[in-house]
Amino acid sequence: ELFKNVVFRLAPIGRNTARRMIRSIKGYEMLTGFRGKPHADIEEIERLLVGLSQLVTDNPEIKELDINPLFVHGAGSGATVADIIITLEQE
């Protein structure tokens, strides 16, 4: 959102697609230890994306899912979803 850069894929996605999605965002350098900062837990972001993809696949009533913000901690330390909005299909 900060960089006005988002990435979308149709579910389900696997780990390789998740990795490519992450690498395609403008802020990717910030996740890799830019200017001496610690590396972010990119593997956890991958796991989160794959898990959310499976959640949406298993629950077709989910129309839209928005996580904002997602706080990514240092490598091996995970990530925290601070807020999530799930929009369901109206019948």
Model-found features: residue ranges?
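ATP-dependent carboxylate/acyl-activation modules
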Residues: 1-91
